[in-house]
Amino acid sequence: MSKIKLGAYNTLTVLKVALREGNGDPFGLYLDGGPAGEILMPQRYVPEGTEIGDEVEVFVYLDQDERPIATTEEPLAQVGDFAYLECSWVNEYGAFLSWGVMKDLFCPFREQKKRMVIGNSYIVYIHLDEESYRLVASAKVEHYLNEQPRGYKHGQEVDLLIWQKTDLGFKVIVDNQHPGLIYEDQVFQYVHTGDRLKGYISTVRRDGKIDCTLQPTGQQHAEDFAETLLQYLKDNDGVCDLGDKSEAEDIKRRFQVSKKVYKRAVGDLYKRHLITVEPLSIRLVK
């Protein structure tokens, strides 16, 4: 059997029932951890009907005594992930973050940008500390980002994690590995640190950072929005009080799209002879 992966999911074979000394009561199952030896899965995490010889998918991490332990709980993230986690308590060594399993995740002071506060949440990177062989979190996420993206194309869909607000817009983490940015004028919805959203590649810059948008790029997006706008007109007596001369902020507030996309959609509906266009409104053709 290959070496188990700490802080990650593993598929392990059930070896035997774990029995308490003295009364012989079962308190879980022992799983085959290969070179790591037998790994306990406590009784409360054992799926009903599990038998000796079965293979089970479990998350393996370290218990209070730094021994590998298996659980069927679903963590909020695993080793190699960036995540937005809440600080649950602190001591003289660092902070401890809730991440969906019984034992909280340790973030030492040296890995904090500023002292973490109980109840606040932070973007962190989860990794296995090579010196202590402990699962730890680091709030210095820029040290773990890959600034040499490869193969991205304009308009490609990606996964985004909102990292932090800046004067330019929002820093994001792209596909759990690269730094990116959504400019303020490209944000047409409420977003918050820790949000996970679908996004689209706008530009890959020379410095390796990626400019993203939250809307599909190009003509297809305008065509899709044209159908949304058409339905809006049908639902509102055939009138929309936004036209070519309307403010971009008013369009953004109403439809969560840019003025450019709105004008393309209006042009599409006009070419199809479905609307008439006025400076401050559009109307369905009756």
PLM regions and their residue ranges:
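Single-stranded RNA-binding regions, centering on S1/OB-family and related RNA-binding modules
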Residues: M1-K286
